[in-house]
């Protein structure tokens, strides 16, 4: 059964806004102390690693963005569907148009006590990996 939990959905949308603003302070404030980030390969990172994790990603993809097309919520679980993209910049490199990428994404946010306890990503990483391989060759 699908229900609308406005408060949890609003927290998830604030998290998206902080990502799009590359606001690591804002992201950190929205994470619970037991926050877990889970990437599309199932790798898990705790809240303590995520400030530097996001900073590193925003350095690697300085124009990273996510666009949410649909939100579905049930209780404190929010599912967001959309796309993400940006331009991969190799270490010491510069932004080049040929390194732009985009992919379809689904995100799952678990919201507890007004904070994001889990941010899980489901996507095909091949578009950015292709750019990374090309830059390395």
Segments (PLM) and residue ranges:
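Short solvent-exposed loop/turn micro-motifs enriched in small/polar/acidic residues
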Residues: 10, 63-64, 100-103
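A solvent-exposed, acidic/Ser-Thr-rich amphipathic alpha-helical stretch
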Residues: 24-75
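Exposed beta-sheet edge and beta->alpha loop/turn motif
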Residues: 83-113
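Low-complexity, intrinsically disordered terminal/linker segments enriched in charged
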Residues: 117-137
């Amino acid at each position: 059964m699908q229900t609308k939990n406005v408060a949890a959905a609003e927290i998830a949308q604030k998290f998206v806004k902080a990502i799009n603003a590359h606001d690591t302070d804002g992201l950190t404030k929205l994470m619970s102390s037991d926050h877990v980030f889970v990437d599309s390969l199932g790798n898990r990172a705790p809240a303590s690693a995520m400030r530097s994790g996001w900073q590193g990603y925003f350095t690697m993809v300085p124009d990273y963005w996510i666009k949410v097309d649909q939100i579905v919520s049930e209780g404190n679980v929010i599912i967001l569907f959309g796309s993400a993209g940006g331009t991969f910049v190799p270490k010491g490199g510069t932004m080049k148009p040929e390194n732009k990428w985009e992919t379809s994404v689904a995100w799952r946010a678990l919201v507890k006590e007004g904070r994001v306890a889990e941010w899980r990503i489901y996507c095909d990483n091949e578009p950015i990996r292709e750019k990374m391989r090309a830059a390395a060759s």
